């Protein structure tokens, strides 16, 4: 059935469209949404929404772009037909309310005309299958409903529905589920990341904004529609409460406006009441989840609330049965005992996909009703949050000097702010401030009063100043214990995000107003590199992450590249250890062609400096890819591709059977050692079962003994210590959480920057410590170690005394080869760009003689 368009002019009369009968999801799919063992794939979901659009004047479907795997990314807009006819006008109202500086006169006229914008995002985590399915039935109900509640929603709300934030994953999980129906693997997660690069971390990308899907949503929904309410649909453990609704547990990021914090309580309470009134059991609030990190909540810093609806999962679309004794309590509630925040326990029984769909529909409808009934309050508070932001008194600004050790990371940081709609100014002349505080690594830099022309200035008196502030300031996480004398309560995610520290970008916080000649930066663009001097030998710095991209481009032209094992002078200039050298037959012309979008300076000299240059080659990289999927493996692929490293993925069978001499280096991303060794269990098809096993570990040892390099990241670095006699232990293994806890913090380390792995780094750096080993070595070389009794730079730590003197990055010889252990999270979520060089250098180091 499709929308019927009658020719516009019949006998001089304009005739409007006649709408066909609205098809139900069941009619389109051939099964009820939520039926046992039935899932629609992404193509079926897209087809259904197209049918709905063709047959309802309340529904508009927009394709915003394409996903990582080239699937259509949809936004479904649902509202009253009159509203849909004037979407541009309502977007303009939202734009004005989002930035009160644009409103001349009384803001109330915009309140009277505006609608509450409610955005619902489904299925970002693709094994949480219900919400993408539910979205079709929920949209159908709104498209055809004639009841007073539906009319109230349509009149007062513009409902933005994203059926899936990860369409690629919807297909992956669906296809896996269909393949395994009726087998022991039915209901298991697929043996691959369900986002091509980020896996589960695609919901930790809301400030770094790296992935295609994240950027589509931010650029074309958040920054256009400025929603007051964001409802993010998820599923959680099957063994606890049936549904979580906000408010969240403490702490909440103090940069979230108090008005928004109060609205989370109000909205969450309304949903909580709706579930209890509907007779639903197992509803918990103010438990399990906090709201501290911006990695999960873009809208908290852009005028709206982001609430989380977490429903207990089934086994994908397969029902489960749980008896009462199998249920487990969670943080801040007892699953067997009624309490104010968990008034009606669920007693166990069958739990199926349809139950999840029903719970989600109740919660989502309650959110829309709240937005409709309190439309004026939502819009007024949205406006007041903006007013408070542009009236912020302290800090006054953050300043980033233009000359940085790592220009690439400077532009990366500025691009994050710019994409998040933060206004960036640039100083036209030198200026002075009363005082400033450095908020970047190393913290030993002196505070500054004078800044040069070209400095970047981020004033806090702007609509999205909170986004800039939470990303640029140092975090002081308020740690707490589960009970007096008990273990420390673990945050839901990390406790630090300070970008100046993570990226190694010199950043200063200025508390008091100052005068400066500033111009707004229209768009952050990475400039191409510069050529200086004359000659055919090019020298360039190792301090900029972009060095790796240039080196790899040189390798693709079959040019020889060398790095300097010590500092030197050439043509009156000094160059540090690690400086790179390349020979250009064509001189400046050849160099300039390679420097497109690489912000590096290449110094040409006529004569090759005389020292013991060490040649490096394009590393032949084998990247371990476990069927017990490691999120860090996806991030590692994304980074390697972005910096133009060729690599080959290696699974367990490859390592056991392939010719490993084809590789210079085999890289193991962060993953638990047991998952690497043992892999998936017997419920999976045979080709996915098991891990490396003893045979795979023996092959790796042989590879290193014969001259290869093994690089282990994060928790994976515990594996060789456990299985081989390397002369080292992980000291965190023997410490309890009462003695030692670092839940995602940025810590100070000392670096041997005369070792090739440390080239380009300063003597002091910042590393991300999260699920991280620290080494006590009796042999090998410590390249990076924890030297300070006060290592915390941002976040939270307990028991820091245990780290003093321990190794963070080690090189351990193994016969003719080596094992490199990088305990900290050197490329964590593509955020810790200040420590990328440890990874890049390890790969190049594997090619040296």
Language-model features: where?
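Intrinsic-disorder/low-complexity accessory segments
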Residues: 21-158, 204-205, 210-212, 216, ...
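Carboxylate/His-rich catalytic cores and anion/metal-binding grooves
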Residues: 139-142, 156-178
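Substrate-binding cleft of carbohydrate-active enzyme catalytic domains
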Residues: 168-171, 190-200, 209-221, 226
